[in-house]
Amino acid sequence: MILDEIIKRTKEDLKKRKSDYPAQWLGRSLAYNPYVPRDVASALSSSAKEPLRIIAEVKKASPSKGVIRENFEPIRIAKEYEDAGANAISVLTEPHWFKGDIEYITQIRRYTATPLLRKDFIVDEYQILEALVYGADFILLIAKALSSKELKGLLAYAHHLGLEVLVETHDAQDVKKAIFAGANIIGINHRNLDDFSMDMSLCERLIPLLPNGKIIVAESGLYEHEQLKELNRIGVDAFLIGEHFMRQEDIKTAVKNIKEG
């Protein structure tokens, strides 16, 4: 299963990074360059004035599709997203399957004021500290990749550092884990990370399991304004969209079209 492979490789890479650059060094970097994360909850909460909130993704490749965008310029892409009115920007930092780099966060941070998500396979507090040092405002935690205890601990650590957390779910068990962990922002990924199959009716089934007051984010398979309107009608606040935008020549127009119709 691809998720297991990615987690295994992530842990191997992490061991080397921790050896090359210990956590206390990261902490020292933070002391010299303090960074206060931006308000993610306000950016992603649906409102009557702006019902459809977009998390636009900077992504070169994926395990299911390979390279998605050959002409890949992270800073330019992020600036176009911001200019088009994206409410947050997701930055892939996983290097092997997604061709990401954590340096992209720092580069993009210099040129944008929009909240940034570190999207990666986070399994250790070290990666959360990294996210803060490199300039992220929130992180992704995948419920399927973590035990309930691990998810709760990592989420608490992120909140302790001032980072918000998007907890990604795909089934009822994941949702239970997210609620138990105390997640404020819960993602529902239409894509199964084990076999890449899509289930576009997932939000309809999982949203009733969520308590009131949570910010709900729909992920994967989104490419039309009408899809977003319908999902917003049943309770989705924000939409994480990557591949659709990455395949467009005119990214700015694509964001405006999907957001405004």
Swiss-Prot record:
Its EC number is 4.1.1.48. One of its GO terms (molecular function) is phosphoribosylanthranilate isomerase activity. Pathway: Amino-acid biosynthesis; L-tryptophan biosynthesis; L-tryptophan from chorismate: step 4/5. Transmembrane segments: none annotated. GO terms for biological process: L-tryptophan biosynthetic process. PROSITE patterns: IGPS. Gene3D superfamilies: Aldolase class I. It catalyses: 1-(2-carboxyphenylamino)-1-deoxy-D-ribulose 5-phosphate + H(+) = (1S,2R)-1-C-(indol-3-yl)glycerol 3-phosphate + CO2 + H2O. Keywords: Amino-acid biosynthesis, Aromatic amino acid biosynthesis, Decarboxylase, Lyase, Tryptophan biosynthesis. Pfam families: IGPS. Disulfide bonds: none annotated. InterPro entries: Aldolase_TIM, Indole-3-glycerol_P_synth, Indole-3-glycerol_P_synth_dom, Indole-3-GlycerolPSynthase_CS, RibuloseP-bd_barrel. SUPFAM superfamilies: Ribulose-phoshate binding barrel. Belongs to the TrpC family. HAMAP family: IGPS_B. This is Indole-3-glycerol phosphate synthase.
